[in-house]
C-alpha cells in the first residue's frame, strides 16, 4: 500500500512539474516577450544588458529595462538609455499595445521608426533622441491620442513633419531639432503654438513657428503628405509646364520693377537689420587699447545688415564689423534674456573680458541695448576649423593639423587650470576653434554656456549643437565637468586626424559615431586608417602619439580621461619639441 501511494505521489509530482514547466514556457513566449526578443535579436551590439534577456525566462517583466503592470503583467515601459544599442527598431515593437513609455535615447539605433508604433495607443512618452534614425516621421504617431512627450531630436530624419501630429491634444513637449526635415511646419493644433526651439537645426524647414516664410515652390510642396502621393502625375506636369511660361513673364516684370525699386529704396531696406541700438544703448570696453568712442561704435552697429553676417550658431548670429581705421572685429548678437538676468550676465562678461591668452579669442567689450547683447570679439581671418576641414577647397597638411590640435589644447587647459574661477567650455567643437592668418588655433565661445544655461532654449541648443562631441555622462545627466570638455577635445582630435565630421554618413551607415569607428578600427588593428588620405606629410610617431592621446580622452569613464593640463604635457613631450613655458603664455597677439 505504501509503495502504491508513493508511486501515485511521484506521478502527481511529475504531472504538476510538467504543467508548471509548460506554464512557464507559455509565459516566456507571451506576445510582449516575443516583441522584446525580436528587438533583442535585431540589435547588432550593446553593452550586454539585453543579452540577459532569455527566451526561457518565465517572465519578461524581470528583464533589465522592462517594467510591467503589477496586475496585468503587461509591458508598460521600456527604458534602455545609453546602453550602446546598435541596430534597427523592429516593427514588432508595435505589438506592445500597453506600452506607456519608450526610452531608447542616447544609443546608436538606426534605420526608420516603424509605423507600427502607432498601434501602441497607450504611449505617453517616446524618447528616441541622440541616435542615428533615418527615414520619415510616421504619420501613424498621430494616432497616439495620449502622447505627452515626443523627442526625436539629434537624428537623421528627413521628409516633412506629418500634419497628423497636430491632432495630439495632450502633447506638451515636442522636439525634432537637428535632423534633415524639410517643408512647411504644419500649423494644426499644438504644432501652431510651438517655438523655434522644437525645430532648430533643420535648415529646410519653414513656417511661422521659426519666423521663416515658405515660398510657393519647394518648401510648401515639401510640407505635403509624407506618404509621397505627389509623384509625377502627368496632369500636374502639364499644369506645371503651362504655369512656367506665364511665370517667366511675371518674373521678368518683377526683376525690372525690383531693379528700379532697388535703385530708389534698396539701401534703406538694409539699414538697421541687426538691431536698433538707439535709446539707452551703452558700450562697455574691457581693454583700454581700443581708441574708439562709444558713438563711433554705435554708428557702425547701425550700418550692419545681412551682408555682414559671417556665421550663425547656437548662441547667436555673428557679424563682421569694420572700423574706419581698418581694424576688424567679430560681433556676436545674443537676444535679450529674461528680465532681471542683466546683472548676472554683465558680471560674468566682466570675468570673461578679463581673460587674455594667446590661444583664446579675446572678448573686447559689449553693447548693452534694449533688445539684445552685442559681444565684440577679435576677428580672425582664417575662419573656423570646421570650415578649413569640411567646407573649403584647400587641404590642411600634417604640421598645420598638429599645431591646431596643440593650440586648442593649450587654450582649453588655460580655461580649466589657470582661470579664476575655472571655466568649463561645454561646447568644444571644430566650429568653435577659430584660426588666424597663420592657421594658429584659438578657442572661442568659452563661458557662454554658463551665461545662458538658465534659458530653456539654450539648453536645447547646446546639447543639440554639440551632438557627436558630447561625453556619454553629459548626455545622460546634463552635468558638465572638465572631463566632459576633455571628451569633446578627444573627438575634435579624431575629427582633425580623419577630416570627417563626428557624425559622418559613413559612420551612421554602420551604426557608429567617430568614437565608435575608432574603437572598431583599434579592435581590427587598423587604427592608422583613421588618417585623412588627403593629408600630406604624416609622421608615424606623431600619429601614434595623437591616437593614444585621443583614445584616452574619449574613454567612456570620466575618471580614466586625463586632465587638459596632462594632455598638453603629452602633446609637448610626445608630439612636438617640448616648450612648456608656452602653455602659461597669457599674452595676446
UniProtKB/Swiss-Prot annotation:
Role: Involved in the signaling pathway that regulates cell wall function, including cellulose biosynthesis, likely via an 1-aminocyclopropane-1-carboxylic acid (ACC)-mediated signal (a precursor of ethylene).
PTM annotation (Phosphothreonine): residues: 460-461, 466
Disrupted-gene phenotype: No visible phenotype. Fei1 and fei2 double mutants exhibit disrupted anisotropic expansion (e.g. during hypocotyl elongation), impaired synthesis of cell wall polymers, and abnormal cellulose biosynthesis.
PANTHER family, per database record: LEUCINE RICH REPEAT KINASE 2, SERINE_THREONINE-PROTEIN KINASE DDB_G0278509-RELATED
Modified residues (Phosphoserine): 384
Subunit-level organization: Interacts with the ACC synthases ACS5 and ACS9 but not ACS2, via the kinase domain.
UniProt name for this protein: LRR receptor-like serine/threonine-protein kinase FEI 2
Amino acid at each position: 500500500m505504501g509503495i502504491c501511494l508513493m508511486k501515485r505521489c511521484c506521478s502527481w509530482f511529475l504531472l504538476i512539474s510538467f504543467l508548471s514547466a509548460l506554464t512557464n514556457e507559455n509565459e516566456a513566449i507571451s506576445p510582449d516577450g516575443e516583441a522584446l526578443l525580436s528587438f533583442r535579436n535585431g540589435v547588432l551590439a550593446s553593452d550586454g544588458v539585453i543579452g540577459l534577456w532569455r527566451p526561457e525566462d518565465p517572465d519578461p517583466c524581470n528583464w533589465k529595462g522592462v517594467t510591467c503592470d503589477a496586475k496585468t503583467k503587461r509591458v508598460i515601459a521600456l527604458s534602455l538609455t545609453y546602453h550602446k544599442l546598435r541596430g534597427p527598431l523592429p516593427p514588432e515593437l508595435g505589438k506592445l499595445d500597453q506600452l506607456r513609455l519608450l526610452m531608447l535615447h542616447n544609443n546608436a539605433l538606426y534605420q526608420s521608426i516603424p509605423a507600427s508604433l502607432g498601434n501602441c495607443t497607450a504611449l505617453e512618452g517616446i524618447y528616441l533622441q541622440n541616435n542615428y534614425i533615418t527615414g520619415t516621421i510616421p504619420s501613424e504617431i498621430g494616432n497616439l491620442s495620449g502622447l505627452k512627450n515626443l523627442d526625436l531630436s539629434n537624428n537623421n530624419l528627413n521628409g516633412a513633419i506629418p500634419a497628423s501630429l497636430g491632432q495630439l491634444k495632450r502633447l506638451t513637449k515636442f522636439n525634432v531639432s537637428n535632423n534633415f526635415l524639410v517643408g512647411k511646419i504644419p500649423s494644426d493644433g499644438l504644432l501652431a503654438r510651438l517655438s523655434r526651439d522644437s525645430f532648430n537645426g533643420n535648415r529646410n524647414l519653414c513656417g511661422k513657428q521659426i519666423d521663416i516664410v515658405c515660398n510657393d515652390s519647394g518648401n510648401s510642396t515639401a510640407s505635403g503628405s509624407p506618404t509621397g502621393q505627389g509623384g509625377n502625375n502627368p496632369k500636374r506636369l502639364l499644369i506645371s509646364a503651362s504655369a512656367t511660361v506665364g511665370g517667366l513673364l511675371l518674373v521678368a516684370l518683377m526683376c525690372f520693377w525690383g531693379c528700379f525699386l532697388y535703385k530708389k529704396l534698396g539701401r534703406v531696406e538694409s539699414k538697421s537689420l541687426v538691431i536698433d541700438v538707439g535709446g539707452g544703448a551703452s558700450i562697455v570696453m574691457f581693454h583700454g587699447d581700443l581708441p574708439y568712442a562709444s558713438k563711433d561704435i554705435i554708428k557702425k552697429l547701425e550700418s550692419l545688415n545681412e551682408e555682414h553676417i559671417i556665421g550663425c550658431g547656437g548662441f547667436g548670429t555673428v557679424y563682421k564689423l569694420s572700423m574706419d581705421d581698418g581694424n576688424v572685429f567679430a560681433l556676436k548678437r545674443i537676444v535679450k534674456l529674461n528680465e532681471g538676468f542683466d546683472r548676472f550676465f554683465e558680471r560674468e562678461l566682466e570675468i570673461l573680458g578679463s581673460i587674455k591668452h594667446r590661444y583664446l579669442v579675446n572678448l573686447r567689450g559689449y553693447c548693452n541695448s534694449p533688445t539684445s547683447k552685442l559681444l565684440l570679439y577679435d576677428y580672425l581671418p582664417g575662419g573656423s576649423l570646421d570650415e578649413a576641414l569640411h567646407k573649403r577647397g584647400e587641404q590642411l597638411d600634417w604640421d598645420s593639423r598638429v599645431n591646431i590640435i596643440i593650440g586648442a589644447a593649450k587654450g582649453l587647459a588655460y580655461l580649466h587650470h589657470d582661470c579664476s574661477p575655472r571655466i568649463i567650455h561645454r561646447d568644444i567643437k571644430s566650429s568653435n576653434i577659430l584660426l588666424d592668418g597663420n592657421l594658429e588655433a584659438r578657442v572661442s565661445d568659452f563661458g557662454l554656456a554658463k551665461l545662458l544655461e538658465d534659458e530653456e532654449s539654450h539648453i536645447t541648443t547646446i546639447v543639440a549643437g554639440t551632438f557627436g562631441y558630447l561625453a556619454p555622462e553629459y548626455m545622460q545627466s546634463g552635468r558638465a565637468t572638465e572631463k566632459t570638455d576633455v571628451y569633446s577635445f578627444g573627438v575634435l582630435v579624431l575629427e582633425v586626424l580623419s577630416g570627417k565630421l563626428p557624425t559622418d554618413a559613413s559612420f551612421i551607415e554602420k551604426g557608429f559615431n567617430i568614437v565608435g569607428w575608432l574603437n572598431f578600427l583599434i579592435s581590427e588593428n587598423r587604427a592608422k586608417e583613421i588618417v585623412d588620405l588627403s593629408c600630406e606629410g604624416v609622421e608615424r610617431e606623431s600619429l601614434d602619439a595623437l591616437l593614444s592621446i585621443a583614445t584616452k580622452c574619449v574613454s567612456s569613464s570620466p575618471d580614466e580621461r586625463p586632465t587638459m593640463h596632462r594632455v598638453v604635457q603629452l602633446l609637448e613631450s610626445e608630439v612636438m619639441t617640448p616648450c612648456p613655458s608656452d602653455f602659461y603664455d597669457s599674452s595676446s597677439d
